[in-house]
Amino acid sequence: MEAVERIENPYGIRLRIFLQPKASRDQIVGLHDSELKIAITAPPVDGAANAHLLKYLSKLFKVPKSSIVLEKGELQRHNKQLFVPEPKLIPKEIEALL
């Protein structure tokens, strides 16, 4: 499975993420093996990192954070899989991987 995959029905983008919590800033770092590495400032405590990741992705894709689905990997840094339905905008870093 690719790090970034376009899905046609229902339309959206599926992301396989390697999450780096407690970073100096929120950013898409690039590919890490077969995953998209994303750094966020939130610590990996009590779901704060996942909540911050959803908020960050909702800003990038211009969708409500409640619409982003964490499909698997809630308690892992590797193999997080998210589905972003009907993104209004696709960031250039992610567009390059499609």
Swiss-Prot record:
Organism name: Actinobacillus pleuropneumoniae serotype 3 (strain JL03)
Lineage: Bacteria, Pseudomonadati, Pseudomonadota, Gammaproteobacteria, Pasteurellales
Gene3D superfamilies recorded: YggU-like
SMART domains to which the protein is assigned, alphabetical: DUF167
Listed InterPro entries: DUF167 (IPR003746), YggU-like_sf (IPR036591)
One of the Pfam families matching this protein, by short name: DUF167
GO cellular component annotations of the record: cytoplasm
Domain of life of the source: Bacteria
Signal peptide boundaries: none
Transmembrane segments: none
Name this protein carries in UniProt: UPF0235 protein APJL_1398
Similarity annotation: Belongs to the UPF0235 family.
